[in-house]
Structures are given as C-alpha cells and as structure tokens.
Amino acid sequence: MKQIQRGAALLTVLALLCTLTLPAAAASDTVTIATVQDFTNFSKQCTRDTWSQGITVELTADLDLSGSDFTPVPIFQGTFHGNGHTISGFSFEKKGSKTGLFRTLTASAVVEDLTVEGDLAPQGSASQAGLLVGENYGTVSRCAAQGSVSGQEDIGGLVGLNGESGCIQSCTSAAAVTGVTNVGGITGQNLGAVENSSNTGEINTQADQETPTSVGGIAGLSRGTIRGCTNSGAVGYQHVGYNMGGIVGLQSGEISNCSNTAPIQGRKDVGGIAGQFEPNTSLTYGPSPSQQLTNSLSSLFDQLEH
C-alpha cells in the first residue's frame, strides 16, 4: 500500500513540474510576452532548439532589460511579432560569438516590428555580432537598432552575419559600429538579401582602432544582393582601412538602386557606393533624368526623320 502511495505522490510531483515548465498559452502555440521575466523565461525555453518550431510570440509591451539576468535567446525558429515595441537596456560583454538579442535565427524564423536599444561588446573571438541577431538565416522585417556594437569579424548594427537564406527587409540602424573585418551598419557580412534598409550610424570613425578591412554603410562584405538601400552615416577614418564603401566595403554580388550621402574615408579602395568590386559582380542603376531625356529626344528625332 505504501508503494502505491509513493508512486502516486511521484506522479503528482512530475505532473506539477511539467505544468511549471510549459510556456504560457502553449496549447495554442502562441506565447505572450508582457514583462522582462516573461522574456527571460522565453529565452531559457529556446535553449532547446526544437522548442520554438511553429510558435508565434507576441510582444505586448516595451521592455527594459537593465539590471536583469536576461541572456541572449540561443536559437529561434518561429515567428516573433514585436508589434512596434522596444526592448532597451540590452548589454553583453562576455566572451563569445554569435551574439545579439537572438544568437541564431533559423531559415524558418521571422522577427518583425521590433526595436532593440543597447550596447553589445563581446570579448574573445567576438565574431558575428549584431544588436538584434548574431547570425540570421530567416527573415528580419521592419526592425531597428540603436546604441553601439563592437567586435572583431562580421559586426553589424542590426545583424552580424546574414546567411544565404537570410533576408533583411525595411530595417534601420542608428547604432555606432566598430570592428576589424566585415563591418556594416546593417550587417557585417551579407550572403543573402538586404532590401529597402537604411543606416544613419557611424561606422569605424575613431582613430584608435586596428586597421579595418571591408567596411560599409550597409554591409562590410556582400556576396548576396543589396537593393534599395541608403546610407547617411559616416564610414571610416582618414588614411585608415581598406575596402571602405558607402553601401558595401567589398562586393561580389549585386547592388541595385542604392545611394550614399555620407563621407567615406580610408587608406585604399574607398568608394561612395562600393570600396572594391570583386570579379563577376553586378551593379544596376535606376534610370537617371538625363538618360530619360536623351532617350525621349532620340525617339522624337527618329519620328521627325520619318
């Protein structure tokens, strides 16, 4: 009889533990985040790489992470609706790579309508760092970054590394960014697509820095596509750095309909749009007013002659 009672008690304890570890509204695959504690619990759940598959997260309030024990979300595979809210007070200064509010977004992940404010300065290898996400293989849409980011390689204001399947759409960054290799206002390295995004933050403008390579207003290094993007943040310091560009530092993919209005400085391979183009590149400009006028006049003369 005692064994039966012990067994029943054990089952009761296990049942209670299970209910404690389940996320809010798990039955409907929707998680609501309204407090810093909610967000911290969500991050801990994402330690299991399959937990977030198919879930939708709704952020319903602005959050200030200052003084909290929040650690970056390890991996996310679902949909995160920021709903226009801001997560501020994000700070990270420990050793590591793939650092950001989210460390990794998989190909199925979507993060939209979210602003991140903070200071990100990982130590050690300090690669693939961005205020929103360290490495992105999913979709980041209508997001913004404010604050500062510093590191070594693949350092971006919003995203550290934008992978082959990664897409960054209609995003902005006003973050000050400092790095050594592949440093950009939106993303450090772009292997996917960056579209209709803009940067206003300064990139590597301090004198006391290691000699940087491949630095751009939108991306430091891009082997993917960059379309419809603008930069108005100063890039580089005089006589310091190689492959310094207003949109991209080192480009071997496609740039289309982009513009830069900021000063670009460096030692070698410095350009208003791209610092250096590698072979097999594509650069497409939109039609200029003068070209349109020339085409119209040519057509008119042809008609008059006939």
Predicted feature residues:
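Bacterial N-terminal signal peptides
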Residues: 10-19
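Bacterial N-terminal signal peptides that target proteins for export
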Residues: 1-11
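Surface-exposed repetitive/solenoidal architectures
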Residues: 25-306
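A generic local structural motif
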Residues: 2-4, 18, 44
